[in-house]
């Protein structure tokens, strides 16, 4: 009950007292004087959060102190905002603070804030000194209408929200509506959920007002705030009505049931499920947002239980959505806010089990029976099975329908008629009442779109069963915002013509129509062609012939003759027909291209147009021509939408397949819908009894299993019903052929293929026909137990298979249960209620299987652009080799097709213009027909043609890759000055480059700046890594996630070029290197791109690309957002692996970067160098939430004052990781924060002693962190060994122990001399075993002691390295044998200038000897591409045995005599590996062969000839001398020893040390 004292505030009575006071502007003077006069105390404690303090507290203090004088004191305390603060820790902090300020029992606490403040401070008041007085001053809409009223106070616990608390009534609730002026939009909308809830349970009139006022409220709250409070002035009265209405209802309920005996539970509508969602999704999703989703789910639950009409559910959902609140977890905002976090049904039910309303284990939920009315005056007990069905994404159908069942089912309104009725009513003049309208996603999108175009206003009557539309006679206005149409194909096609009728506004001259991913591939081309031909400008914004499209607002198309291809969709025809009366002259619509599809739907449109006052004439001579007069629609007083005949096929089919009876009471012979013939044309021939009147249809199925196949049925008049017919045919005797349904391939999915694939899961054979499907039935008892049925997000697929499931011999799991909402949201309810089918809700099992294997990659073709001479052909060749894709040089391909060279084409009469035209046509052909699996190198001048630029831009905007290859401009110019093979430029080369440069950048989405001076045959390592990023094949992120400790080193140099000598040393032990762009000496885009290229080449590890602003501890200007975005885009274009994105950047920057990131991983960061935030409370939560939305990695960096701050950080991080698995880098800067760096674990930023400065205070090196980890027990020391005999003089301990020390690892490497493998069995299985090197004589003997052996070691037949590995997800350690000898050989040869051989550059190799090392040498030469591989040895038998043990493609040959050498002139070796002992003379016959081979003249002076000596002693062997005398380069054996040990270290530790350090340790004093 409310009362008002004249001009004063309005008061609401609660528990017999007028303690709720509502008005604008009461916070300062009124509250102060009311407190001092009516709630006197010596101490008032005002508690608020840090967001509100500065805005509202100082002014209140001033007024209060002036009014109170010396009689009372006012203390203030602030806490961090957000749900995170609402816990035991914060409550204790407040209580301790109050005690320290001598607060006693007369204290009055003022809770200023939203729900968190009110709930928790109320609980403080309830328990402090066994209870003190408090007042609520709610500042959010949600708190004003809900949480501040009723005395429920509480804190959250890990088990759930509000589980510890007390009933403690406030002495006053001061609701100052002026607080809403500064309330953020999202918070305001959050509060509207509680307002809607109250109206939904209590007052339909108020609910209707909420529906009507949604546009005005949203417009007001989205307007810019001003100091005068004008933002909400237009809705001031509406706001007061909303707050008084909701607060009044709550006060009334609380007064009747203060302690929640039953009635007060009604206020929990939406909360049973909403709180469960909130427990999982907090703090990313707000309370009201969770309640909004909860209300929809609980309304669906009431509908499933049969107590709430479908129309009421639709109306509630529409109202919630109209306030931009989410209605499901699939809402794109919720997905973004929570990073797609799952809400498992079992967890939701567990959370629902901890609810104060419950009766023991029985769950209680508030059920609606109508809008404004609940099913019971309390929460109702609902079984878990029903709740599980509503919450689950999938449903398991148990077969079986009661015998003799006879039911009547009224399907929802026809989607086809509903959408047409909405379009006609919106364009009509006057008011019409539409009854039986389909409540579905499609009609929801249509209604929303019509409202956006301001074409009509609408309201609901009769509990949502009647839609009242007031049309404006076709006066539509273009929309600023795109019309989002989901997957609603009907709406998209109808509205494409309708928006052409729009008039332009001051702010826009066109309207964009868009939809979801599937909608963006569905065809709309013929309709657009027809509109374009009639003067309407329509532009495709993405894929040609599909949405999104931009349609100019031309106030109606020209009219006259319009030709339209109608063989794909009749909706194109209906779209033009309905808009035609508003054309500028009468329309003659000619359908061309063959027989129109679905003529029945065209006839339906014409009949409905007549109902709205426009009569279409069909041409007497040409039945495919229609004459539409000018005019305007006149809305009939009432229009009744008959049930959807396509949907009616499902209940009728259930009757048919189960031998029961079903009646559809409102579809009969006179129906406008073609699908109404389904019962007569399909079910009757299949053996059903069909009775049909003008307005009803009744079907009785034959005995179970007695359905008959139909040899052939043309379903062109009812194409949507073919899916229902197909599932019946699956259990019919014989083969059914269905034709006339070609259009079903371009519906929500390719339905013909979908039916074929899903029926195959039941063991039913189907064949696709050109325009249909053939189904061979089988006895229903023989149907297979199917895999889960995938529905392709297609409502008709889901409902069809639900029909088959009621007869299948096994339970059937149908995925994507909710897709039926498109046309029949309550289908599963009907199946359960009417047909008594047992349903069970289930999770989607396929998600668990595919989650890990879903790393994205792309097989889209890559187009390479750039100046002539920039290296496109070279890069294309590299790319082709790496990706194993064909390379097509478009210039070469053009010459092939034209049968003339490019200069010849240009010199001909065709000239440059003809050449460019041919070039463009070739590009179009390649994009259209070879868009996958190719690499294309484009001509340098291709970008001169605007049409070519548009093609490339469109290609990369739609997921393709266009790569700009560039190198130093001076190098390119010099090359082109020398190149005489191409047409000469008619202008200065440099001018050409600078003219084309912006075009190259415009058409490309990636760029590779080559730091290399020549185009080598082999792709350099930096290019391979760049390509792995842009193609999505890089596994670096997954690799570092799997490591317990990973690091990136922060590079603090102003110019990478000047630090190239130290970079290899600096990056040792790190997994990535950070380029601090803000510290570079120039931010010129080309300079920055070059820095990336140089760093990638020098560091050989992934790059973290960072721009750190001044306020976050860097050097980049805080507000230079435009430049920041340009620099971010350079990072993305250059394919960096990681990009650090500051969360303080504006939304448009964050959005642009994340939408164009490709395969780069975003590190969403926030730094707090001024120590404003605390890990202990919720201060970091807003930044974590934002980072969760935008980042693949979250990076939060605070400042530590004392060591204990690191423990608070660890607790925070653990809490966040429990809720979301997204990796977190969380650190404290400063000396006291070093411990946080030690314990961080994932990608810890580190420094290096060789760097000029540290990137942040307190930063450590990777080696220092490893040392610290060892000290605190986080990194256990491991023992490594060398096994073999003799080994006493081995250099391996010096190598490995030296590297352990350099990298900070606490491990020890020692010798274990033995020639018996069994001696090491216990060692390699000990807990502290880290790995082992194995030498003679154990390389073969150790294999049986291992769990697995690498492919290389298997081929070589020897193991020289043992590595303990733990498979992912397993605690068990397995021992893997590998061989690094061959790796060492390859590395040493590569270092000496040997390049891998290719098919275009073949070469022979040679191995000397036939001992154990020979096999590794053969393997190494094969890896380098050498063929043939000659072996020179004493024993031909041993050589043959070696050759036989390798595959034939190794091409191993024996050289036994100098004559054989002479005969092999064309295949003599350029690489020789010697594996014979060096301390004995070389066998004479072998020596002769070697002399002949080594002294043979070199083919080319440029090509190096190298001999690799595997013997260690003496360091310079006779064979080396022999080779050197013949002009060969030689490599001593110690080089290979160092290299193979270097590889061993990497395999054991995951750390790549400098090779120079490994080499120095091995060489010792020998150099």
Curated annotation (Swiss-Prot):
Chief location of this protein within or outside the cell = cytoplasm
Q: Where is this region: 3-dehydroquinase?
A: 1051-1264
* Annotated active site: 260 (proton acceptor), 275 (proton acceptor), 819 (for epsp synthase activity), 1167 (proton acceptor), 1195 (schiff-base intermediate with substrate)
Q: Provide the reaction this enzyme catalyses.
A: 7-phospho-2-dehydro-3-deoxy-D-arabino-heptonate = 3-dehydroquinate + phosphate; 3-dehydroquinate = 3-dehydroshikimate + H2O; shikimate + NADP(+) = 3-dehydroshikimate + NADPH + H(+); shikimate + ATP = 3-phosphoshikimate + ADP + H(+)
Any idea which positions bind NAD(+)? 49-51, 83-86, 114-116, 119, 139-140, 161, 179-182, 190
Region described as Shikimate dehydrogenase: spans on this chain: 1277-1567
Query: A GO CC term?
Result: cytoplasm
List the keywords (alphabetical).
Amino-acid biosynthesis, Aromatic amino acid biosynthesis, ATP-binding, Cytoplasm, Kinase, Lyase, Metal-binding, Multifunctional enzyme, NADP, Nucleotide-binding, Oxidoreductase, Transferase, Zinc
Q: Subcellular localization, per the record? A: Cytoplasm
UniProt xrefs under InterPro entries: 3-dehydroquinate_DH_AS, Aldolase_TIM, Aminoacid_DH-like_N_sf, DHQ_synth_AroB, DHQS/DOIS_N, DHQS_C, DHquinase_I, Enolpyruvate_Tfrase_dom
Gene Ontology MF terms in the entry: 3-dehydroquinate dehydratase activity; 3-dehydroquinate synthase activity; 3-phosphoshikimate 1-carboxyvinyltransferase activity; ATP binding; metal ion binding; shikimate 3-dehydrogenase (NADP+) activity; shikimate kinase activity
Q: How is the cofactor bound?
A: Binds 2 Zn(2+) ions per subunit.
Q: What is its EC number?
A: 4.2.3.4, 2.5.1.19, 2.7.1.71, 4.2.1.10
Functional note = The AROM polypeptide catalyzes 5 consecutive enzymatic reactions in prechorismate polyaromatic amino acid biosynthesis.
**Membership in a protein family:** In the N-terminal section; belongs to the sugar phosphate cyclases superfamily. Dehydroquinate synthase family.
What is the protein named?
Pentafunctional AROM polypeptide
- Native species of this protein? Podospora anserina (strain S / ATCC MYA-4624 / DSM 980 / FGSC 10383) (Pleurage anserina)
């Amino acid at each position: 009950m409310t009362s008002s004292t004249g001009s004063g505030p309005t008061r609401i009575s609660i528990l017999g007292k007028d303690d709720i006071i509502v008005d604008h502007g009461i916070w300062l003077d009124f509250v102060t004087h009311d407190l001092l006069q009516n709630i006197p105390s010596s101490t008032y404690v005002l508690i608020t959060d840090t967001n509100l303090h500065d805005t509202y507290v100082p002014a209140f203090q001033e007024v209060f102190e002036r009014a109170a004088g010396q009689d009372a004191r006012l203390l203030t305390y602030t806490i961090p905002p957000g749900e995170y603060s609402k816990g035991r820790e914060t409550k204790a902090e407040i209580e301790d603070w109050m005690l320290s300020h001598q607060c006693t029992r007369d204290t009055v606490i003022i809770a200023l804030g939203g729900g968190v403040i009110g709930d928790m401070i109320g609980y403080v008041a309830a328990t402090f000194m066994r209870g003190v007085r408090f007042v609520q001053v709610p500042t959010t809409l949600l708190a004003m209408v809900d949480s501040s009223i009723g005395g429920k106070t509480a804190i959250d616990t890990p088990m759930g929200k509000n589980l510890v608390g007390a009933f403690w009534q406030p002495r006053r609730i001061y609701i100052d509506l002026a607080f809403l002026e500064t309330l953020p939009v999202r918070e305001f909308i959050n509060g509207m959920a509680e307002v809607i809830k109250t109206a939904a349970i209590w007052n339909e009139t108020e609910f209707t007002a909420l529906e009507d006022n949604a546009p005005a409220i949203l417009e007001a709250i989205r307007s810019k705030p001003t100091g005068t409070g004008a933002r909400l002035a237009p809705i001031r009265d509406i706001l007061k009505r909303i707050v008084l209405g909701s607060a009044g209802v709550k006060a009334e309920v609380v007064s009747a049931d203060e302690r929640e005996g039953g009635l007060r539970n009604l206020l929990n509508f939406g909360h049973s499920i909403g709180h469960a969602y909130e427990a999982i999704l907090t703090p990313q999703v707000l309370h009201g947002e969770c309640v909004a989703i909860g209300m929809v789910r609980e309304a669906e639950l009431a509908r499933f239980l049969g107590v709430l009409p479908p129309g009421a559910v639709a109306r509630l959902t529409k109202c919630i959505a109209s306030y931009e609140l989410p209605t499901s977890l699939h809402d794109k905002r919720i997905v973004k806010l929570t990073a797609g976090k799952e809400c498992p049904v079992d967890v939701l039910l567990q959370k629902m089990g901890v609810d104060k309303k419950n009766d023991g284990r029985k769950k209680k939920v508030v059920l609606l029976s109508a809008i404004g009315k609940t099913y019971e005056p309390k929460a109702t007990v609902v079984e878990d099975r029903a709740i599980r069905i509503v919450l689950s994404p999938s449903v398991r159908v148990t077969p079986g329908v009661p015998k003799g069942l006879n039911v009547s089912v009224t399907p929802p309104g026809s989607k086809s008629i509903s959408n047409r009725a909405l379009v006609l009513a919106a364009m009509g003049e006057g008011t019409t009442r539409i009854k039986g309208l389909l409540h579905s996603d499609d009609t929801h999108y249509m209604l929303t779109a019509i409202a956006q175009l301001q074409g009509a206003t609408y309201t609901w009557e009769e509990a949502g069963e009647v839609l009242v539309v007031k049309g404006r006679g076709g006066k539509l206005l273009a929309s600023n915002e795109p019309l989002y149409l989901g997957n609603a194909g009907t709406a998209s096609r109808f509205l494409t013509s309708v928006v052409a009728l729009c008039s332009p506004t001051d702010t826009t001259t066109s309207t964009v129509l868009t939809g979801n991913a599937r909608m963006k591939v569905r065809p709309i081309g013929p309709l657009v062609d027809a509109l374009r031909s009639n003067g309407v400008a329509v532009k495709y914004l993405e894929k040609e012939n599909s949405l999104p499209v931009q349609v100019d607002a031309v106030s109606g198309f020209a009219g006259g003759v319009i030709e339209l291809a109608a063989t794909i969709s009749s909706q194109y025809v209906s779209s033009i027909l309905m808009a035609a009366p508003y054309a500028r002259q009468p329309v003659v619509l000619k359908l061309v291209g063959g027989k129109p599809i679905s003529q029945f739907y065209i006839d339906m449109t014409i009949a409905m147009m007549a109902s709205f006052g426009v009569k279409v004439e069909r041409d007497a001579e040409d039945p495919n021509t229609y004459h539409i007069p000018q005019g305007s629609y006149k809305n009939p007083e009432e229009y009744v939408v008959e049930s959807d005949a396509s949907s009616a096929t499902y209940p009728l089919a259930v009757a048919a397949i189960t031998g029961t009876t079903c009646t559809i009471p409102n579809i009969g012979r006179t129906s406008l819908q073609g699908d109404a013939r389904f019962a007569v044309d399909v079910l009757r021939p299949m053996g059903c009894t069909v009775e049909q009147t003008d307005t009803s249809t009744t079907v009785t199925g034959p005995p179970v299993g007695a359905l008959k196949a139909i040899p052939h049925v043309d379903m062109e008049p009812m194409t949507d019903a073919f899916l229902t017919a197909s599932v019946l045919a699956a259990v019919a005797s014989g083969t059914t052929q269905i034709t006339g349904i070609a259009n079903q391939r371009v519906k929500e999915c390719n339905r013909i293929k979908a039916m074929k694939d899903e029926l195959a899961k039941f063991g039913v054979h189907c064949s696709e026909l050109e325009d249909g499907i053939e189904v061979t039935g089988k006895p229903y008892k023989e149907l297979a137990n199917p895999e889960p049925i995938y529905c392709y997000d297609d409502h008709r697929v889901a409902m069809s298979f639900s029909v088959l499931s009621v007869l299948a011999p096994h339970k059937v799991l149908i995925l994507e249960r909710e897709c039926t909402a498109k046309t029949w949201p309550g289908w599963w309810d009907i199946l359960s209620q009417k047909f008594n089918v047992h349903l069970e809700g289930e999770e989607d099992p396929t998600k668990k299987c595919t989650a890990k294997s879903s790393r994205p990659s792309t097989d889209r073709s890559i187009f390479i652009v750039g100046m002539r001479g920039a290296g496109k052909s070279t890069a294309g060749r590299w790319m082709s080799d790496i990706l194993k894709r064909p390379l097509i040089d478009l210039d070469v391909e053009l010459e092939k097709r034209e049968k003339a060279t490019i200069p010849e084409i240009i010199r001909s009469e065709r000239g440059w213009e003809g050449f460019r035209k041919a070039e463009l046509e070739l590009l179009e052909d390649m994009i259209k027909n070879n868009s996958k699996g190719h690499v294309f190198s484009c001509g340098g001048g291709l970008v001169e043609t605007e049409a070519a630029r548009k093609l490339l831009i469109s290609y990369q905007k739609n997921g393709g890759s266009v790569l700009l290859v560039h190198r130093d401009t001076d190098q390119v110019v010099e090359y082109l000055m020398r190149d005489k093979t191409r047409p000469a430029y008619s202008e200065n080369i440099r001018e050409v480059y600078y003219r084309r440069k912006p075009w190259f950048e415009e058409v490309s989405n990636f760029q590779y700046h080559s730091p290399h001076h020549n185009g080598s045959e082999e792709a350099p390592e930096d290019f391979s890594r760049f390509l792995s990023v842009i193609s999505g094949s890089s596994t670096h992120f997954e690799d570092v996630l799997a490591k317990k400790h990973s690091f990136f080193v922060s590079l603090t140099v102003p110019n990478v070029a000047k630090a190239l000598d130290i970079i290899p040393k600096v990056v040792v032990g790190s997994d990535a290197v950070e380029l601090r762009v803000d510290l570079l000496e120039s931010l010129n885009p080309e300079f920055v791109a070059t820095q990336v290229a140089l760093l990638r080449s020098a560091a050989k590890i992934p790059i973290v690309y960072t721009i750190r602003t001044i306020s976050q501890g860097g050097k980049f200007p805080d507000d230079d957002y435009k430049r920041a975005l340009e620099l971010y885009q350079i990072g993305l274009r250059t394919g960096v692996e990681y990009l650090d994105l500051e969360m303080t950047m504006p939304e448009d920057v964050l959005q642009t970067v994340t939408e164009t990131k490709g395969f780069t991983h975003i590190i969403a960061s926030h730094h707090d160098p001024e120590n404003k935030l605390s890990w202990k409370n919720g201060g970091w939560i807003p930044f974590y939430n934002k980072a969760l939305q935008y980042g693949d990695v979250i990076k939060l960096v605070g400042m530590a004052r004392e060591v204990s701050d690191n423990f608070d950080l660890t607790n925070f991080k653990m809490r966040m990781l429990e809720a979301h698995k997204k990796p977190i880098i969380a650190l404290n800067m400063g000396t006291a924060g070093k411990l946080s760096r030690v314990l961080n674990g994932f990608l810890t930023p580190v420094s290096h002693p060789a760097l000029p400065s540290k990137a942040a205070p307190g930063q450590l090196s990777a080696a220092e962190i490893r040392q610290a980890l060892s000290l605190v027990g986080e990194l256990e020391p491991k023992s490594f060994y060398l096994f073999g005999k003799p080994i006493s003089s081995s250099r391996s301990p010096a190598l490995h122990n030296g590297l352990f020390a350099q990298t900070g690892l606490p491990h020890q490497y020692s010798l274990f001399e033995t020639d018996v493998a069994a001696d090491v069995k216990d060692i390699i299985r000990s807990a502290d075993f880290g790995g082992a090197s194995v030498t003679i004589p154990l390389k073969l003997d150790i294999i049986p002691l291992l769990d697995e052996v690498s492919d290389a070691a298997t081929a070589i037949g020897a193991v020289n390295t043992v590595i303990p590995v733990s498979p992912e997800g397993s605690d068990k350690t397995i021992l893997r044998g590998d061989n690094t000898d061959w790796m060492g050989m390859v590395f040493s040869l590569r270092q000496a200038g040997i390049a891998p051989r290719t098919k275009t550059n073949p070469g022979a190799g040679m191995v000397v000897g036939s001992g154990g090392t020979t096999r590794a040498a053969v393997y190494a030469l094969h890896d380098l591409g050498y063929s043939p591989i000659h072996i020179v040895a004493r024993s031909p038998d041993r050589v043959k045995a070696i050759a036989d043990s390798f595959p034939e493609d190794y091409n191993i040959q024996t050289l036994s005599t100098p004559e054989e050498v002479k005969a092999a002139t064309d295949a003599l070796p350029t690489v020789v590996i010697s594996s014979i002992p060096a301390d004995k003379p070389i066998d004479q016959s072998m020596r002769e062969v070697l002399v002949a081979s080594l002294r043979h003249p070199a083919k080319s002076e440029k090509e190096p000839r190298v001999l690799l000596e595997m013997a260690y002693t003496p360091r310079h062997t006779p064979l080396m001398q022999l080779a050197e005398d013949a002009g060969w380069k030689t490599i001593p054996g110690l080089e290979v020893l160092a290299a193979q040990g270097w590889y061993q270290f990497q395999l054991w530790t995951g750390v790549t040390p400098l090779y120079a350090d490994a080499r120095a340790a091995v060489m010792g004093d020998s150099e």
